[in-house]
């Protein structure tokens, strides 16, 4: 029914336009008999030369003689327009009455076509939303436009990254060198440099030299491989043997003399040397 309503409105608009064109092409001729008329009824019978504007402000219906033709044309145009609208409405009603089934069928076809096109329109809209410009790689752009550090040497490589700092390679190389080097000393104790321990060759006789050397190597191996066990063993010995040992007149756990220079030694080494001297 909505389609039929739209058809009726379109017919009304066409009829009104055609009626207006007919009125403009064929204006109605009014006989110039020297009288003023309105709607076919004679209001006043006065000559045009006598008619003029009333000076009384309360008389709102005064008519000037020069506007009679415009008033007649206006009334005739309104009458013709009303007649054209009446005819158009009558024709539309007749069409809707006689061809009502056809109008309903056409409106149903239009709605069906729209429903069939609706999924296609949704797909097109979804594709339009999915197609987006490729985002710019911010990290790559930052590397390309970064200002190089003149203090660091650079090496060009065939990767996406334009430059790689050479000091990174040097750092990895130095790390490998340290890992494959000898025994690393992570922590140090500071003892006076004048506190020197006697060498095993001077103290031990020839028969005990090899035994002491093997013991020293074993202690060093344990200190490298199992530092936690050595530390626990040393602390246990300190609890079982609380007596202080004297070396050259100084106590082992005495506070160091700050006036003497300090020499770094590995952890637990003073206790190892004290134990060895005690065994002798």
UniProtKB/Swiss-Prot annotation:
It is found in: Secreted; Host nucleus. Its main location: secreted. Residues 229-249 are annotated as: Disordered. The RxLR-dEER motif acts to carry the protein into the host cell cytoplasm through binding to cell surface phosphatidylinositol-3-phosphate. GO terms for cellular component: extracellular region; host cell nucleus. This is Secreted RxLR effector protein 39. Belongs to the RxLR effector family. A motif (RxLR-dEER) lies at residues 49-70. It comes from the Eukaryota. It comes from Plasmopara viticola (Downy mildew of grapevine). Keywords: Host nucleus, Secreted, Signal, Virulence. Residues 1-19 form the signal peptide. Secreted effector that completely suppresses the host cell death induced by cell death-inducing proteins.
């Amino acid at each position: 029914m909505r389609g039929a309503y739209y058809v009726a409105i379109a017919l009304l608009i066409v009829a009104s336009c055609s009626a207006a064109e007919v009125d403009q092409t064929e204006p109605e001729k009014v006989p110039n008999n020297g009288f003023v008329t309105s709607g076919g009824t004679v209001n006043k019978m006065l000559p045009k030369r006598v008619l003029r504007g009333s000076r009384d402000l309360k008389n709102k219906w005064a008519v000037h003689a020069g506007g009679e033709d415009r008033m007649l044309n206006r009334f005739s145009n309104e009458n013709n327009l009303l007649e054209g609208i009446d005819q158009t409405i009558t024709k539309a009603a007749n069409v809707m009455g006689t061809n009502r089934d056809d109008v309903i069928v056409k409106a149903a076809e239009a709605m069906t076509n729209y429903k069939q096109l609706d999924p296609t329109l949704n797909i097109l809209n979804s594709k339009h939303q999915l197609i987006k410009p490729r985002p710019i790689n911010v990290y790559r752009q930052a590397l390309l436009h970064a200002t190089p550090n003149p203090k660091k040497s650079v090496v060009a490589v065939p990767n996406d990254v334009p430059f790689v700092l050479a000091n990174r390679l040097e750092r990895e190389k130095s790390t490998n060198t340290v890992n494959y080097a000898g025994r690393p000393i992570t922590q140090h104790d500071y003892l006076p440099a004048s506190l020197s321990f006697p060498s095993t060759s001077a103290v031990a006789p020839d028969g005990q030299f090899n035994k002491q050397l093997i013991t020293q190597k074993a202690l060093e191996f344990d200190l490298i491989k199992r530092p936690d066990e050595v530390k626990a063993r040393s602390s246990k010995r300190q609890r079982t043997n609380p007596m202080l040992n004297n070396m050259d007149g100084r106590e082992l756990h005495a506070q160091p003399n700050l006036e003497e220079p300090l020499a770094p030694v590995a952890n637990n080494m003073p206790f190892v040397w004290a134990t060895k001297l005690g065994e002798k």
